[in-house]
C-alpha cells in the first residue's frame, strides 16, 4: 500500500480505498482502510484497529491487524516493515488504554466485547499490545449498596485533561 498512498494529515472524514488510490494520499484512517480492503481482496482476514487517544500525545491512530498462523498480527497501514508485529507505534501501544475494532454482526470470540449493536460488535484488542489484567469496578451508594445502572467513565490523563476512552453503564449492580 505504501506504493499507492502517501501519508498526509487532514481533518476530513475517512475516504474509501478507491478514493485513496485516486488521490495517492491519506491519513492513517484512509491508509488502514486501503490495506484492509487489499488484504481481504486476496482472502486474508484483516481488520482496522484504532486507539482514540495515545498516552503520550493528544492524538489517535489507526492501523491493521491481519490473521496469519492462527492469530492476529499487527502492521502499519502504509508503513512497510520487514516483519509482522513491528511498527513505529509498538512502544506507545504498550502504554495505551484502549485499542479497539469493530466486527460486523454478532461476535463470540475471546476478546472483551465493549458494545453490541444490530450491525456490529466492538471489541477491545489491547491484549495484543500490552500486558492486561481484569479490573472490577463496584459503584456503591452512601449506604455501601451496589448501584444498578451506574455509569463509569474510564479516562486517560494527557495534555492536562482527562480524556474519556470508554463510557460504561452496568446493566446490573457491580
Where are these regions (language model features)?
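Hydrophobic/aromatic-rich core segments of domains that either
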Residues: 1, 5-114
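Membrane-proximal bilayer-interacting regions
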Residues: 50-53, 59, 125-131, 148
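Conserved beta-strand and immediately adjacent loop positions that scaffold enzyme active sites
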Residues: 63, 136, 151-153
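Extracellular ectodomain segments of secreted/surface proteins
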Residues: 112-132
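A short, amphipathic beta-strand motif
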Residues: 133-141
